[in-house]
Amino acid sequence: INKGLPRSMELEYEGFYPAGIFVSTKGAEGGAKKKYALIDDKGRLKIRGFETVRRNWSFIAKDIQKEVIEMILRDHDPDKAYSHVKQVIADLRANKVPLDKVVIFTQIQKNIDSYHSVGPHVAAAQRLKAQGREVKPGTMIKYVVIKGKGKIRDRVKLDTEARQDEYDANYYIENQIIPSVERIFAVLGIDTESLSIKSAKKGAQSSLAAFGG
């Protein structure tokens, strides 16, 4: 292949990957895919651009995304992967997922006072600072989103403050679990809308309307 390329270009052999998943990124128009997962002939995964290799996500979201990729590429079983996601969602709703799995990790990029808008991670950093801890650019913040009303930033606690029965399952399902897998399933033509709590509520309302009709 290299013989047909310009002199300034040369391809290097990385390995043989029998299967892979390529997912488009929001806002990407053409060009190379920014998210992909490959499995080589020895069963080893190579993951680039997915939440499994990024911060700002909880362990449960990272774990389930990697497990879904493994079930699709290693087991060739998308249905098994989908059922697994449904089970994890059920466990979240039943408060069976351990607290340490819903902890969200993020890094403060600048001084707290420099943030014009207060997001959940900034609110958590403010709590940490209020405890007398030093918070500066590069500080790793660990927090949990708990149940309650109001904005998400008003419902965060540090991982050392939160209790097992406090975490907001709905938040993690809608903002962590589903976003971490929906584009993977979309590539396979599998709709994840039924996993959403909003979808479940619509279904319940439709059933009640039909019953009352």
Name every feature range the model reports, one short phrase each:
Residues 1-213:
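DNA-dependent DNA polymerase catalytic subunits
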